Design a protein with these regions (language model features):
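Transmembrane alpha-helix termini and helix-breaking/packing motifs in multi-pass membrane transporters
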Residues: 34-47, 102-108, 162-186, 260-261
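Helix-loop junctions on the cytosolic side of multi-pass membrane transporters
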Residues: 134, 138-139, 143, 178, ...
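Helix-to-coil boundary motifs at intracellular loop junctions of multi-pass secondary transporters
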Residues: 38, 42-43, 81, 135-139, ...
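Substrate-agnostic recognition of the 12-TM MFS/MFS-like secondary transporter fold
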Residues: 15-33, 60-98, 113-172, 190, ...
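Juxtamembrane intracellular "pre-TM" segments in multi-pass secondary transporters
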Residues: 1-15, 203-238, 261
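Helix-loop junctions at the membrane-solvent interface of multi-pass transporters
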Residues: 98-109, 173-174, 195-203
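Loop-to-transmembrane helix entry
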Residues: 46-65, 259-277
Length: 289
């Protein structure tokens, strides 16, 4: 019997999980873009050297991505060992604590605190990543997996881009109260994600007796060897990694590029992200066809 992938959005086995991962992606990017907005506000106020703005804008994505390289193999083991809905609740609780630290950084306008919080956000996202994908085969039927994955990618990508828009507009809309608005926004979004995570049904751990290997190097090498042996896995890893690498680098530099090289305003930046969002959403939905 034919079914629509959107039918999954009416089911408790999928909707809370879908909402949580979208909240997480949205908040991460609100936070990152609010940092860029703060940099612009500090330059305008004369409290930061304009040359440092570009440096921090380049540094922020690297700080966020670094934990993926360091801890992905360990995070994957936790996803195998821990009951999945419990692990999601743990990661969303971590997000509340991390965003509380970020709020302090915004209020103090202290980039050191914000970069520490950004690194911690990367750690939290690294821990959430494996369970985000490994939970789907446990809650979806085989014929629902392609459509379900498409919805997740659509939700994630659009949440990322909308988060960038929202975060970028915080200081433009709130003006001199931008730091307070950013602090409140990231904490409230983290709390919302944690509350929704409590509705995710229990999903048993895949390997509850697994012994965690804390050295990430041997585990990472073993994963790479496994991916090398399986062509489909290798190509999937390379494709997804390249998409997020190029997307993160391009969108992270888009605000400065639009202003400095194109002579545009915030409107041009918003328009470019909106076009990209439409393309990502359309592609994700078409993957089931």
């Amino acid at each position: 019997m034919a079914h629509s992938q959107f039918d999954l959005l009416r089911q408790r086995r999928f909707l809370p999980y879908f909402t949580v991962q979208a909240f997480g992606a949205f908040n991460d990017n609100v936070f990152r873009q609010a940092i860029i907005g703060l940099l612009g506000a500090m330059v305008a106020a004369g409290t930061m050297d304009p040359a440092l703005r570009g440096t921090y804008a380049q540094l922020a994505p690297a700080v966020f991505i670094l934990p993926y390289f360091l801890f992905s193999s360990i995070a994957g083991q936790f996803a195998e060992r821990t009951e999945k809905s419990k692990l999601i609740r743990i990661t969303t609780a971590m997000e509340i604590a991390i965003m509380s630290l970020a709020a302090v950084g915004f209020l103090l306008q202290d980039m050191r605190v914000l970069l520490v919080a950004l690194f911690a956000t990367g750690v939290q996202s690294t821990l959430f990543g494996p369970v985000k994908y490994s939970i789907l085969p446990s809650v979806l039927k085989p014929e629902e997996l392609t459509g379900g994955n498409g919805l997740v990618e659509m939700g994630t990508s659009i949440a990322v881009l909308l988060g960038m828009l929202f975060g970028g507009l915080i200081f433009a809309v709130a003006g001199e109260h931008g730091t307070q608005a950013a602090a409140v926004a990231v904490i409230l979004l983290a709390i919302c994600g944690n509350l929704v995570s409590r509705a995710i049904p229990r999903v048993d751990a895949s390997a509850p007796e697994l012994k965690i290997q804390w050295n990430p190097i041997p585990e990472s090498l073993a994963i790479l060897r496994l991916a090398k042996k399986q062509l489909a896995v290798r190509n999937s890893v390379l494709g997804v990694s390249w998409f997020w690498f190029t997307g993160t680098m391009l969108t992270g530099n888009l605000p400065v590029y639009a202003e400095t090289h194109l002579g545009g305003t915030q409107t041009l930046y918003v328009f470019a992200l909106a076009i990209f969002s439409i393309g990502v959403g359309a592609g994700s939905l078409l993957c089931e066809k």
